[in-house]
Each structure stands twice: as C-alpha cells, then as structure tokens.
Amino acid sequence: MKKTICLWALLLIVVSCTNDDNYNDEHGDKAVIPPKGRIIRIMTYNIYGARATSPANAADLDALAEVIRRQDPDFVTLNEVDVFTNRTGKDVHQARDLAAKLGMEWHFSKAIDRDGGEYGDAVLSKHPIIETRSYRLPCAASQPGEDRSLCVIRVEIDGKDLYV
C-alpha cells in the first residue's frame, strides 16, 4: 500500500512538472522563454538619485555608468531616478543621460513629483525598444506612503517579443 501511494505521489510530481515554453498572463500577454543557449543579462540598480556614489552626496552619473558598463547587461532596471530636480540638476534627466553615456535606449516612468521635477523608475536597453508602458502604483489609503511606478518595455530578440 505504501509503495502504491509513493508511486502515485511520484507520478503526480512528474505530471505537474511539465515544461511549457510559453504561457499567457491574465492580460493575454504571452511570456516567451528565449532560445536555449541565448543569455540575456538583466541588472537592477537602485541609484538613489545618483547621490550614493559621491561622499558629498552630489549626483555622479559617470560613476554609475562605469558600474553598469563593467556588468555589461542587456537591460538595466533603475530605481529612484531623478528627472529635472533641484537636488540633481534642472537640466539632468538621469535615465536619458545614463542611456546616452552607455549607448542604450531608455524609458522612464514617473512615480511622484519631487523637488521641482520628477522621481520614478526607468529601464535601459541595448536592444531597440518597440513599445513602452508606465503604470502608477498608488499606496492604499489605509497604508499611506510614497506612490511607486512600474516601467515596462517590449523589445524583440531573435524574432520573439520580450517584456522587461
């Protein structure tokens, strides 16, 4: 009897571990697994408004660009990005300026107004960006705090759509 139960349990585990290369999410978007052998490097980086790289707390995009360059990612997701703020410069768009230093494309998603400018998240891409989406993620009234954002891009790699 124990042997039969163990065999059924093993069969259930094997059946539940089937490998489906594609699936649809609740919006009908298809997630694509890249072809075997293709490595895609994704880096996430909380840049703290680019202030954490300098002892004087001044924005240092060159230092951030060097950190990213050494990792050689295909995509970089950035958190705490300043755009035209007083604290990091009214002419500084951190996502745009970092992308230019790295030869990448970019998309910025605003979360909130901050210090005379905007503050949010961004994605940098070595691959041409086909589509961009931005989502505001407001805090619940019962749990007040700082609103967040979600930044999504669509690129094509080897003839397949990839969302980052």
Language-model regions: role of each:
Residues 1-4, 19:
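Positively charged n-region of N-terminal signal peptides that target proteins for export
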Residues 4-14:
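Sec-dependent N-terminal signal peptides
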Residues 11, 70-72, 126:
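Alpha-helix termination/capping residues and helix-transition junctions
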Residues 17-106, 112-121:
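N-terminal, active-site-proximal structural segment of metallo-dependent hydrolase catalytic domains
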Residues 39-52, 133-135, 152, 161-164:
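Active-site-proximal beta-strand elements of phosphoester/diester hydrolases
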Residues 100-101, 117-132, 156:
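Conserved beta strand-loop-helix elements of the APE1-like EEP
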Residues 128-162:
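Active-site catalytic loop in hydrolytic enzyme cores
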